[in-house]
């Protein structure tokens, strides 16, 4: 009885919250993906797997596979991965640079990093159209990649910076005393200490980049369709909520598989940080 009371007092509120606002909505979306479209924005019986067949490219009318959705999904993973890679290349050294500054300058740099969040996201993305316009016909995919990197770079830098602040630099001195080069000492003594922030930063960057549709709509000019655009169109213009729900679950599955693979690649420590 005492154990039950402790559970209700500690994990109980969190469990109820996750059940009501995470598990239950996901179950509703999954049920929608199995229903039949009856009208614009309406679904009903009977249950069917047609929506899932369409997700994986099977055209029931012509009884053939048209892998358009899978191509869009692959493009989305590719662009999100590139944006995440750019955030790593730019954000990792930036986090070290900020941490190496004086207290006053460090606060200023962090403020400058956070200031964009004070402006509406749409306004910031539209501003990039004005910035890129003088360069003429800017490739749509490159513009989308640039917009994603700009939008999600702070999400990568902040958790990495939090890890860099806790780095024990005495381990670097010990590695150099044992004959390691500066690069080897950094890789062996510093990178493992920043791995928690690196894992968190990659996740916070890749997941929203994979599902975004605003950046590709505005900067891509509807020429670079990503999976987020497909989902948004089903719940908006097309009004096919059943098919949109199936696409949403496909996107969720890809994200979960990607996180699992990244955790495995990062090793046991990365898995613990992810949990």
Please name every model-derived segment.
Residues 49, 122-149, 183, 219-223:
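Membrane-interfacial helix termini and adjacent extracytoplasmic/periplasmic loops
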Residues 1-29, 107:
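N-terminal signal-anchor/first transmembrane alpha helix
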Residues 4-6, 38, 51-61, 217-264:
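Interhelical loop and adjacent transmembrane-helix boundary motif
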Residues 25-65, 131, 217, 221-222, ...:
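Short membrane-interfacial helix/loop motifs at transmembrane-helix boundaries
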Residues 4-5, 78, 104-107, 141-143, ...:
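Amphipathic cytosolic juxtamembrane alpha-helices at the membrane-cytosol interface
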Residues 2, 9, 161-176, 188, ...:
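C-terminal transmembrane helix and the adjacent membrane-cytosol boundary/short C-terminal tail
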Residues 64-97:
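Transmembrane alpha-helix signature in integral membrane proteins
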Residues 12-24, 115, 150-152, 156-169, ...:
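Transmembrane alpha-helices
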